[in-house]
Amino acid sequence: MLILASASPRRQDLLRAAGIPFEVEPTDVPEIPQPGEHPNASAERLAHEKAAFIARQRPNDLVLGADTIVVVNGEMLAKPADPRDAARMLRLLSGRPHQVITGVCLIGSEARTENRELRTFEDIRSETTTVFMDSLRDADIHSYVATGEPMDKAGAYAIQGMASRWIPRIEGDYSNVVGLPVALVYRMLRKHGAES
């Protein structure tokens, strides 16, 4: 059974829509980038920490961890700490292309073909999507932050929500911007014989 090491309703919706069966086991791993860490490395490390935390509790299951980071002008944006932080992030993103990076980690066991012995594997990857956001007026930012929608999202916006009106185009995987690169996850599951 695939265990999603995340309480994110968006990740759950994406897996459900793709027809991938799973159970949810949320983690309390702090999502803190390390100083000087490359954004992809940070997203991959945090995804690994989440998956490893649950894998220790459920060693016979396949565990999927993920972490999403937004990068603009070299600054990594995680989830906003408060409404003021959300407004600050939206001002940074306003009128600028930025990258959404999701690190994904799959931990489990698979049989070796020659002797059917089980071995543990860790498959860690990341996906990057470029998002183009229109320029936002202060009134747009304040009214959007007041809805509460930005508060639990990396970069303080939801492409699948009200912020979609400010995003004319993206380059890359849409589901990655929502929070989980589904095609990448499916390829990883298939590689390890666990796609069904």
Language-model features: where?
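N-terminal beta1-alpha1 ligand-phosphate binding loop
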Residues: 1-20
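Anionic-ligand binding patches
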Residues: 2-3, 36-196
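Cofactor-binding loop segments of dinucleotide-utilizing enzymes, especially the Rossmann-like FAD-
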Residues: 7, 27, 109
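N-terminal functional modules and adjacent low-complexity/disordered segments of proteins
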Residues: 9, 24, 113-116
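Flexible, glycine-rich phosphate/dinucleotide-binding loops
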Residues: 11, 31-33, 113
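Short loop/helix-cap segments at secondary-structure boundaries that form the rim of catalytic
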Residues: 13-17, 34, 56-57
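A structural micro-motif
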Residues: 20-22, 61
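A short beta-strand-loop structural module common to alpha/beta enzyme folds
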Residues: 23-31
